[in-house]
């Protein structure tokens, strides 16, 4: 019994380390990243400043991008931990942890416990989940609620128990309160496709139109929408439903366009270091298709992949809404992986890329068209510390050793490289990105705050400035006497005015406009 239990204990330890390292290690060390982290965090702070916890504002203007649930969670975290990066990110880390735990619990019902633990560890240390579990946005919250609804719906379809259906409606209602219609669309469409394939649309219709379930959804989701519609009226409908939902699918929002194959590299990179496992599942589609549960999980991934590939607006994290089922399938088929070289090659290339990154940045500088990014990247060298190179080199060395070793289980090797990668990215790679992009914003804000300067933002979208500044920062055309935060390249565009430099770093300037 001890010998049989030993592998499970190892996987338990790896899964716990994977979750702790991916979502909580150095969670508050990096400054908030713009645009999204800055926008969510500042909107949460303005709820406190306005004494209004029903509607969201960003720099004094109504913000209709997302519903209220993530802001409530961030507000609770700020109340508990204070105004800092950890507090803003903690709800995402907590939701990502719950997402992994739910995936493990679901997988354990149908597969050996070791495979369920593999699914949890693979999921927690995959690059895409690692990132989304650490950022102060609504996406980790949405993912756990989509996963909860999809698991509950399957359990209802399998057992017929109404309790699982009620759990699904509750999760969908919370998802609608977290990010809107997408939380309804995914379980609705995937279950329709599955029941259609199984020629059982009657069961689907009974579940979808269950009166008690619809009532539960309405009780969970609709009160806030009713209140905000009463308060904001058509502006909310236009801003949230039409612009940020219909508009995202039908057109390109905020420049986030992409081709039909946009998500192919996104999925391959986002699955690192487990890309080979993903490819293995895709080569076993016929086998997957003939198992009801595996077919359901594959349909979940396929619908999300196709739907967002057809969408006019594309962002990398959208495809994660369908990856939960794929992570379970990757764990199920991991035991059949034999080639150490093939399995570990993607993560080796990742570490080699990190080693070469400083040189790649330097070589590519002349080809960067935007003067702001060119100036910011020109100072990148100072942020690549010896620790960065030691981490990337050690990761490559461990991976090469794993390629030679024949004793350790291949899936275990992949998870260990995933844990090394996530810990190293948090400790050494994120500080590089933060130093280049966000440190100038934070430093400028702290200078303005310490001197009690009245600042406006001009031709710059950096809401994290307001978080560190401690108050909303209006955006408008500058006038003589204004203190302006902007990009250095924009100074030449000041309409006939001069300026006095207060702060300058990496293409960001804080200036006083003179007549």
Please give the residue ranges for each predicted region.
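Membrane-integral, polyisoprenol-dependent glycosyltransferases
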Residues: 2-342, 504-509
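Membrane-embedded architecture of ER/inner-membrane glycosylation machinery
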Residues: 2-4, 166, 249, 281-515
């Amino acid at each position: 019994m001890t010998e049989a239990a030993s592998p499970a204990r190892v996987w338990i330890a790896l899964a716990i380390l994977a979750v702790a390292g991916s979502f909580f290690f150095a969670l508050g060390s990096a400054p908030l990243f713009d645009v999204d982290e800055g926008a969510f965090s500042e909107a949460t702070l303005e709820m406190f400043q306005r004494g209004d916890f029903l509607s969201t504002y960003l720099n004094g203007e109504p913000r209709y991008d997302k519903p209220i649930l993530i802001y409530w969670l961030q507000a609770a975290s700020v109340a508990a931990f204070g105004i800092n990066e950890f507090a803003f990110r903690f709800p995402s880390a907590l939701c990502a942890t719950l997402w992994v735990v739910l995936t493990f619990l679901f997988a354990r019902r149908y597969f050996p416990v070791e495979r369920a633990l593999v699914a949890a560890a693979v999921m927690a240390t995959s690059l895409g989940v690692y990132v989304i579990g650490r950022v102060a946005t609504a996406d980790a919250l949405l993912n756990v609620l989509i996963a909860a609804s999809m698991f509950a719906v399957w359990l209802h379809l399998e057992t017929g128990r109404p309790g699982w259906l009620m759990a699904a409606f509750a999760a969908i209602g919370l998802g609608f309160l977290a990010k809107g219609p997408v939380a309804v669309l995914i379980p609705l469409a995937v279950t329709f496709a599955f029941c259609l394939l199984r020629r059982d649309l009657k069961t689907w219709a009974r579940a979808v139109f269950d009166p008690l379930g619809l009532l539960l959804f309405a009780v969970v989701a609709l009160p806030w929408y009713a209140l905000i519609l009463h308060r904001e009226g058509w502006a909310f409908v236009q801003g949230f439903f039409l612009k940020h939902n219909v508009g995202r699918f039908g057109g390109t929002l905020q420049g986030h366009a992409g081709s039909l194959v946009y998500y192919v590299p996104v999925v391959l990179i986002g699955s690192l270091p487990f890309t080979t496992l993903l490819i293995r599942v895709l080569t076993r589609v016929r086998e997957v298709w003939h198992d009801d549960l595996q077919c359901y999980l594959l349909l979940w991934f396929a619908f999300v992949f196709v739907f967002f590939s057809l969408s006019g607006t594309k962002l990398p994290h959208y495809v994660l809404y369908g990856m939960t089922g794929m992570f379970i399938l990757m764990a199920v088929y991991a035991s059949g992986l034999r080639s150490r070289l093939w399995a570990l090659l993607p993560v080796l290339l990742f570490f080699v890329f990190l080693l070469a990154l400083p040189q790649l940045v330097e070589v590519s500088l002349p080809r960067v068209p935007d003067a702001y990014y060119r100036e910011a990247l020109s100072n990148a060298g100072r942020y690549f510390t010896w620790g960065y190179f030691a981490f990337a080199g050690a990761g490559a060395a461990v991976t090469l050793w794993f390629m030679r070793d024949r004793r350790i289980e291949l899936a275990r090797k992949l998870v260990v490289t995933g844990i090394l990668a996530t810990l190293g990215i948090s400790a050494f790679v994120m500080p590089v990105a933060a130093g280049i992009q966000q440190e100038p914003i934070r430093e400028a804000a702290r200078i303005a705050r310490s001197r009690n300067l009245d600042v406006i933002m001009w031709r710059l979208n950096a809401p994290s400035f307001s978080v560190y500044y401690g108050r909303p920062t209006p955006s408008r055309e500058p006038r003589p006497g204004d203190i302006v935060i902007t990009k250095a390249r924009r100074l030449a565009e000041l309409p006939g005015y001069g300026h006095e430099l207060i702060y300058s770093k990496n293409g960001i300037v804080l200036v006083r406009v003179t007549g």
